[in-house]
Curated annotation (Swiss-Prot):
HAMAP family associated with the record: UPF0352
Highest taxon of source: Bacteria
InterPro entries on file: UPF0352, YejL_sf
Family to which the UniProt record says this protein belongs: Belongs to the UPF0352 family.
Protein name in the entry: UPF0352 protein Spea_1764
Pfam assignment, any one: DUF1414
Length: 71
């Protein structure tokens, strides 16, 4: 069963396009891009997710990321 998102595809695609445009603007190689994006994820987890939920959210994110590259 597909997971329903509360965000539209247009919202998600717009943010992705902007993030990728910034990385392209800086001619960021893949390893630097992944490092920067990973640091952004860490920042969001630390600033926007309650401490008691961070580990679970991080694990869910990691599992979703792993599944997305297997498909």
């Amino acid at each position: 069963m597909a997971i329903q998102s509360k965000y539209s595809n247009a919202q998600v695609e717009s943010i992705i396009a902007e993030l990728l445009a910034v990385l392209e603007k800086h001619q960021s190689p893949t390893d630097l891009s992944l490092m920067a994006l990973g640091n952004c994820v860490t920042h969001l987890l630390q600033k926007k997710v309650p401490a008691e939920a961070r580990e679970v959210v991080a694990e869910q994110f990691a599992k979703a990321l792993s599944r997305s590259v297997k498909s």
